Design a protein with these regions (language model features):
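Accessory C-terminal segments flanking Radical SAM cores
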Residues: 1-120, 141, 392-444
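Conserved C-terminal portion of the radical SAM core fold
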Residues: 14-25, 249, 268-274, 294-444
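Glycine-centered loop/turn positions within well-structured domains
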Residues: 24, 155, 282
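Non-catalytic membrane-proximal stalk/linker segments that position and tether the catalytic domains
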Residues: 78-140, 173-203, 209
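C-type cytochrome heme c attachment motif
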Residues: 81-82, 155-159
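Detector for the c-type heme attachment site
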Residues: 84-86, 160-166
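Core AdoMet radical
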Residues: 140-152, 163-199, 212-228, 240-259, ...
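Distinct, well-ordered alpha-helical segments
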Residues: 231-235, 258-265, 366-370
Length: 444
């Protein structure tokens, strides 16, 4: 089997629970609980929500079986429209990125269907009938979970909606109550959802089945450092001994770092902070209102201090295991050198700090300034425990903020400014060059 033009690896190894409890294909997919979204998918209109179905039942529901079948045969899935639109416009999509990031899993799926088809072609009809029923059933539970325990957030970003920001949701609800016309055009943005769906013992018992399989966990919000559900979940993983086998990824707006957050994530194998910083100075403050640029810079420095301090505490803890009466200066130095060598070889938690600006019509003209600031900060804060990168994201919505809507003069200006990016930034940020090339195409 050769993967089709609509194939995405996620339905074979990834499951997402949105802030309102909806079980979705991924973070940019449409919400399956919306009616009439599935075209000819078999489970049209069927709710996919943790209040109405278990995670494991959702994993191999009629909907998921149909999605896998369509993707394997090259048919489009209605809920994947954002990726198709990006690809039509010549931009990178989550589908393409997922297939690239998980290329080994893609090969495994290809191999599965090759073996299946070979066996199917030589089987008798009764066997074929049984095989037809199980062809797109995935027995293994997903190794990648994206869970969002509510929408608590301290910002009201320009591109966001109430489902991901409690403050913005409250503001939109207030506006819609005063203006019926606004409610008509922004119904989903102003709607109040149930964000306490995880306060349910059945859900936690169901999630327990997944934990031995999970290798990657993506948590955001809202702002993940504020969401209590994240702390509850992570502490449970630590107490049950799963943390050492799991890599964590967080999106954070860099406005709120707490010591307990660093203390918690330090138990996990690898931790990636996706730093949602969209510009320098006023650009950042305008897009991610009401953040303050000075505070963002200070918090970045605090984050580095806390990461380094955590590693120093580990080294001290390592030394204190030895009886002080037998620990002379020479022996202590030898032990420190040994532990430092281990740290340099990825002993303990490894941190990855990734600048993830959302590129849109507002900040595309100052993208070079953000890259150069990020490069300089990274250079000034080198650490053997931290890997730096920049992975910009093309805006997924709302469409009117897409840089494609910029006029010719502004596009020309933004294209010219890309030449100001520090050349060494492309060496440090290995993901930057392909993205800038795509930007140039989009702006031309």
């Amino acid at each position: 089997m050769t993967i089709s033009k609509t194939f995405c690896i996620y339905p074979w190894m990834h499951q997402m629970i949105d802030t309102n409890g909806a079980v979705k294909l991924c973070c940019v997919a449409e919400d399956p609980t919306l009616p009439n979204r599935f075209g000819d998918v078999k489970s049209e209109g069927q709710a996919m929500h943790v209040d109405q179905t278990s995670l494991s039942n959702a994993w191999n529901s009629e909907y998921m079986i149909s999605v896998r079948e369509r993707m394997v045969t090259g048919k489009q899935v209605m809920d994947c429209g954002q990726c198709y639109r990006k690809e039509r416009e010549g931009q990178s999509s989550f589908r393409l990125r997922a297939n690239k990031d998980w290329k080994e899993k893609v090969k495994q799926v290809e191999q599965y269907y090759k073996i299946f088809n070979d066996e199917y072609n030589t089987a008798d009809q009764p066997t074929k009938n049984r095989m037809d029923m199980s062809k797109h059933y995935v027995e293994d539970l997903p190794e990648y979970l994206d869970i969002r325990f509510g929408n608590l957030c301290n910002l009201k970003c320009r591109m966001c909606t109430g489902i991901y920001s409690k403050k913005l949701g409250e503001e939109l609800k207030e506006i819609s109550n005063k203006d019926p016309e606004f409610k008509k055009i922004a119904q989903s943005s102003a709607e109040i959802y149930n964000f306490d769906w995880y306060d349910n013992e059945d859900f936690w018992q169901e999630l327990e089945k997944y934990l031995p399989h999970v290798r990657l966990l993506y948590l955001t919000g809202g702002e993940p450092t504020l969401v209590e559900g994240n702390y509850t979940f992570l502490r449970g993983l630590i107490d049950k001994g799963y943390a050492k086998n799991i890599s964590l990824v967080f999106n954070t707006n860099v406005t709120n770092f707490q010591q307990r957050f660093l203390d918690t994530v330090n138990h996990f194998d690898r931790v990636t902070f996706n730093l949602s910083i969209d510009g320098v100075g006023g650009v950042q403050e305008y897009i991610r209102y009401p953040s303050k640029w000075k505070a963002v810079q200070q918090n970045m420095s605090k984050l580095m201090d806390k990461i380094n301090a955590t590693n120093q505490d580990k080294t001290l803890e390592y030394l204190l295991k030895y009886d002080p009466q037998f620990l002379d200066i020479q022996t202590a130095n030898q032990l420190l050198n040994t532990q430092t060598s281990k740290d340099n070889n990825a002993s303990g938690t490894q941190f990855r700090l990734v600048f993830t600006p959302t590129v849109n019509v507002i900040n595309v003209g100052s993208f070079d300034e953000l890259v150069n600031w990020a490069y300089q900060f990274s250079e000034d804060n080198k650490s053997n425990k931290v890997n730096w990168d920049m992975e910009p994201i093309m805006l997924q919505g709302p469409q009117f903020q897409d840089m494609a809507w910029a006029n010719k003069e502004y596009k020309k200006y933004a294209l010219q400014k890309l030449k100001n990016i520090e050349p060494k930034a492309f060496e440090l940020f290995t993901s930057l060059h392909p993205f800038v090339n795509k930007m140039k195409i989009a702006l031309s």
